[in-house]
Amino acid sequence: HVVEHFRSSLGIPSHHKIKSAADILVQHIMRKNVDTMCEDTHFNEILRLISHSKYDRFPIVNKEGDFIGVVDYSDIRDLVVDPAFSQLVVAKDIVKPEPLSLHSDQTLGEALDVFRSHSNITYLPVVDAENHKKLVGIVSQNDVLSSFRTLENKNN
């Protein structure tokens, strides 16, 4: 019953065989409700949103809803902000274009490799496997590690 609970919690069909991390995809463990900011969000609003969030990186979308990058709190926290600056700067001015992201069809093992290579990153945006401009979720390093532990316990 533990295996079935694991499957259902990840949204994996019961006929899909899980033997290794290669059998679990990022889309199975990602969080689908993602807070995003529009590219024209003012700097002071960005600070407000980040300060009330558990995430330190925020996905930025353009007016069409396409994923264009992330704003990373570590990049902006040291900026000395005067009131005029905070009204002039918007998200698209400080966005990191083409950020590190995962594709929804990547395996759990591939996701772990990305997090191992970038140990300073705790969350990654997940984009559609076919359309890399479509943001479909977010996955944390803890989500990946927790799924690995559950898989290891299941196999022992």
Name the predicted role of every residue range.
Residues M37-T41, H103:
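A short beta-loop-alpha structural element at the N-terminal edge
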Residues V2-N33, L47, F67-I68, D72-Y123, ...:
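Tandem CBS (Bateman) regulatory domains
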Residues H42-F43, I50-P59:
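Long hydrophobic segments that form regular secondary structure
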Residues N62-D66, D128-N131:
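Short acidic/glycine-rich beta-turn/loop cap or linker motifs at sensory/regulatory domain boundaries
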Residues P59, Y123-P125:
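Short hydrophobic alpha-helical runs that function as membrane-insertion/retention elements
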